UniProtKB/Swiss-Prot annotation:
Pfam assignment, any one: YbjQ_1
Similarity comment text for this entry: Belongs to the UPF0145 family.
Lineage, highest ranks first: Bacteria, Thermotogati, Thermotogota, Thermotogae, Thermotogales
Gene3D superfamilies, sorted: Hypothetical protein apc22750. Chain B (3.30.110.70)
InterPro entries: UPF0145_dom_sf, UPF0145_YbjQ-like
Record's protein name: UPF0145 protein THA_1434
Organism whose genome encodes this protein: Thermosipho africanus (strain TCF52B)
UniProt superkingdom: Bacteria
Amino acid sequence: MIITTTENIHGYEIVEILGIVMGNIVQSKHLGKDIAAAFKTLAGGEIKAYTEMMTEARNKAIERMIDEAEKIGADAVVNVRFSSSSVMSGAAEMLAYGTAVKIKKSNE
């Protein structure tokens, strides 16, 4: 499965557009880590607990998007985008979405 943020895949031709696919997850951090993160905001700098949470959420959202694409027989997902939103304090939704397509090697 090829996943790309671009419209096209070098060396391939899109032969069929199957439609939009997406994967999402709502994830939260442990209360203790949330408290530690609150103190970190006072001092400034990276809040590693939240960086890790968002990385994990993004990866899970990609996995779920790929699962959805595979279910409809896609070879690739193009124009992949991400969106995140706060659902509640300490919890965020990560959404990965793109266009599922069938591809073939081009004759270039």
